[in-house]
Amino acid sequence: MTSVIFLGTPEFAVPILEGLIAQHYDILAVMTQPDRKVGRKLRLAASPVKQAAQKHDIPVLQPEKLSGSPELAQAIAMAPDLIVTAAYGQFLPTKFLEAAKIIAVNVHGSLLPKYRGGAPIQYSIMNGDSETGVTIIEMVKKMDAGDMFAQAKLPLTRADDTGTVFAKLSLLGRDLLLETLPKIIAGTATRTPQDPDKVTFSPTITKEQEHLNIHLPAKALDQWIRALRPDVGGYVYLNGQRTKLWAITPLSAGSTLPAGSIVERDKHRLVMVAGQQTTFQVDELQPAGKAKQSIADFLNGPGQQLVSGQQVITDDPE
């Protein structure tokens, strides 16, 4: 039985771990991020991968920082055949990668060499890509730079957001990994070096990027909103109040009003201006301190005072 140390943290990694278990790989240990405080009550919560590992009685290692930790020494001493990572979230020391008797591989959520880094799915949506995918690569010291063993593509549509693409790529990555690992173990897998001229990066989304730019064309604004959904949410300042836009629909009609202005408003509909004289319909939003609301609930509640012609979204709170 081939032994594995698995590293992963979010829901994306759970089907991959479950797939390895179902295919009778011997999971010696699971390494995941430490429990974190979540929610308004800041309750300590285990990562999805930890919860999955505990269901199968697999030992769990949770170093705050892997490099130099007792958990690192413990994992190296296990001398696994394979190290498999999927969205773990920490730098892996070279001496740990070299502890694998066969190889250390990563399931990466993009079509490498495009979008190395921690937020490939968000950037693929944000940039309006027509497709994304997963790549199985060898883990090396340089981030996401190892040789590629396999890729699988996934079309992207306007119905997608980061949540839906995460779920789809998780299953696609699981299947591709389970198809590729036997070839790697047998020494028959083909290695393809990454083209350095085609490398792009997808650094972790910053707090500043959560502030939506109302001067973007409506189509691009929609892409940003979907890239930040469902976990974070992008916000604007609407009448000076921080308001999250969870869903909009770009429209074909244009307007000469300034970006952030209301073009049309009734009890059930709110149409606004974005950049380059484009327009969009607001479908779902969330005023500060309140729950998500349909646009009808908002217009008949907190947004009753909004009227056509007003410029209500500004770059900064007034």
Curated annotation (Swiss-Prot):
Its EC number is 2.1.2.9. One of its GO terms (cellular component) is cytosol. (6S)-5,6,7,8-tetrahydrofolate binds at residues 110-113. One of its GO terms (molecular function) is methionyl-tRNA formyltransferase activity. Keywords: Protein biosynthesis, Transferase. InterPro entries: Fmt, Formyl_trans_C, Formyl_transf_N, Formyl_transf_N_sf, Formyl_transferase-like_C_sf, Met-tRNA-FMT_C, Met-tRNA-FMT_N. This is Methionyl-tRNA formyltransferase. It comes from Lacticaseibacillus paracasei (strain ATCC 334 / BCRC 17002 / CCUG 31169 / CIP 107868 / KCTC 3260 / NRRL B-441). The gene is fmt.
